[in-house]
Every structure is written in structure tokens, then in C-alpha cells.
Amino acid sequence: MAKSFFYDIWERKELNNILKINSGRDYKQLNSGNIPVYGTGGYMLSVNDKLSDTDAVGIGRKGTIDKPLYLKAPFWTVDTLFYCTSKENSDVKFIYLLFQIINWKRYDESTGVPSLSKNTISSIKTYVPKVKEQDHISKLFFSLDNTLQLHERKCEELTL
């Protein structure tokens, strides 16, 4: 019989109960280096200082608001990209998976350039299991993603 990884019921919580939303900052005063800088479109360049030394999930504040990024520490984010760190009761990789299924455009606060605020993100409600189950789920999906990427690279090599 297969071992079940699912233990408890999932609780409905606001995102502010499982994560902390941090603001990006301007990087132009920094020198070139090996720390990646991310904006809403992804990787931009590398600098010599970090904004965070904890893995996080990036979500656009302005512009592209519906393409979450998994940010491996250390990193820097510009001011148009929030970075969300996990609280003690949550797994950052699980938060990334949650962010993939949220309909971010539904929470757009603008009449022009798509925008999100910390308050809006904080108040989004979702269902969350205990951290142990979050860890199992995130490991499963990240393993599947890694396997898919490996096979995609192999297919690309075969077509060359």
C-alpha cells in the first residue's frame, strides 16, 4: 500500500499569516558582481550586494503581476518586484506553488499599468496545510519540474 503524505485538513488563511512581503530597491548605486538582480520580467543583471540571503518568491508590484518567480538567495530585487519570505509555519517552495495558481489579475488595483499592493497580497485567502505537508508537496512538484527540465534538455540535444 502506498504511503500517504497528506496528514491533516487544510486551513483557510490570509497570506499574511504564512509570509512576509518585502519591497525591492533601486540597484543603480551598486557595482557589478555575482548577485542576481530580478525585476518583474526575471533576471536583469548581477551586482555586488544582496537584498536578501533567504530564498523567496517574487511577485510584481507594477507591470507583470501574474508571473511569480522563485528567488534563490542571495539576490536583489528592483522596486517593481516584491519578494515574499516564508514565516516559521510555512515553506517558501510551497508558497511559490500557491502563487502559481492564484489569479493575480483578479487583484489588479490599477486602471493602467497592472499593480498590486502589500495590503492586497496580504489579505488574499487560500487553503494551507501544516508545514510538514507543505514540504512534501513542494518536494514532489519541484522534483517533477526538475525531471521535466532534464527531459526537455535531452530532447533539445537530440534535435541539434
Regions found by a protein language model. Give the residues of each.
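Amphipathic alpha-helical coiled-coil/heptad-repeat segments
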Residues: 1-13, 127-160
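Non-catalytic DNA-recognition/assembly elements of restriction-modification systems
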Residues: 3-37
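Proline-centric
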Residues: 5-9, 83-89, 105, 119-135
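Short, intrinsically disordered, mixed-charge
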Residues: 20, 100-104
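Conserved, well-structured core segments
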Residues: 36, 82, 139
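A short beta-sheet element
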Residues: 39-100, 109-113, 117-121
